[in-house]
Amino acid sequence: MLTNLRLKMVLMITYLSHWDWILYKSRKDLVKYIKSEEIHAMCPNGIHREEIESIYKGVSSWEINRNKILDIKAILSLRSHLKNVDSKFHCFTLKTGILFCLANLFLKNKNKAVLSITGLGFLFSRSSKAKLLRYLLKPFISYLFNNAINVIIFQNTSDKDIFLNFSNFTNTTEVIPSSGIESANFKIKDLPSSNPAKKKVILVSRLLYDKGIMDYLSIVNKVNMVNIEFYLAGERDEGNPQNISDKDMEIVLNEEKLNYLGKIDIETQLSEFDISLVMSSHEWFSRILLESLYVGLYCIAYKIQGTEVMREFNNLELIELNQIDKFVDSIEKYNEIIDNSKNRQLIDEFFTSKVVASQFEKIYKELDVSN
């Protein structure tokens, strides 16, 4: 009897995502700081399965076809799980949130839920498919989200306004900039004693069109200085409508002036470069920009919602959208960065995993005492 009573008193929350990488990459460092909850994971089986099992209290498999915009089988599978588990849920990404809302429809046992929208993504892109999907969802989106989600966490106020205008969401909203970084894990770049002979430029990103991959290729071909080397790190995102085509991937691989690295260990390898570019056309809060600023790279980024929030940082230049020649000019004129200690102090105070985890934990506690 005592054991059963104890089990009922355990506060449990399930981190839910349609991609195992999301629960591993930026959420793994949050778990150890959240002491008031038993954190479980639910996601598809993937290459990070073993790491996820070592981090979370328990792991449930959720098979989903990422190539489908709406996987009906995955929705039904999630619905069955929701019927049989007593847990709060924290959904990560808008796509996962939509699937959760559909699975939760008309269920009697309402599991309280938080949604972190870390990017408006495909749904709010300009493609004809996205416009059609928005048109189809518009009549139902308000009911779906207000019925299933208690709290939505955004990463900047601009995108929050866009989403609320579309969804008419009236429950609680919070703005928590960034997903947090575990700053102690990063190798810091040493300040050079002299101007380096070779200057290394890198773009780290999923290989998506809206991440500016093709713009980056244009820059590579426009810069003519022999002492500048260009690198691209990241992988394709199968199932994402913005995933670059096989043909364009071949162009990337065949570009003689570009070194394609695939996946890298950002925490230990980012310090090997001098300049970090962020060329996304939209971004809620650029994690790679935050990481680059912490490590000590000079950063050049498009001026969008997810980068402008970091305008007070040193060694950061923001450029208006589509001004590729200004990127070229800035790269060619780059000399050396100034002291980076201010950036590290700001990040350690406001943007670490520990800081974000404490904000999450506060939200979870408020859910527990709400009706």
Language-model region placement:
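A conserved mid-protein helix/loop that constitutes part of the nucleotide-sugar donor-binding site
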Residues: 23-29, 203, 208-222
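Acidic anion/phosphate-binding donor-loop and adjacent secondary structure
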Residues: 67-70, 164, 174-198, 209, ...
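Short hydrophobic beta-strand element within catalytic cores of glycosyltransferases
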Residues: 298-301
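Aromatic "clamp/platform" in nucleotide-sugar-dependent glycosyltransferases that forms part
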Residues: 281
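Membrane-proximal helix-turn-helix segments that form the acceptor-binding/catalytic region
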Residues: 32-34, 76-79, 132-152, 248
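Short His-centered aromatic/hydrophobic patch
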Residues: 91-99, 117-118
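Glycosyltransferase donor-sugar binding loop
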Residues: 42-48, 181, 204, 229-244
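Donor nucleotide-sugar binding/catalytic pocket of nucleotide-sugar-dependent glycosyltransferases
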Residues: 142, 146-188
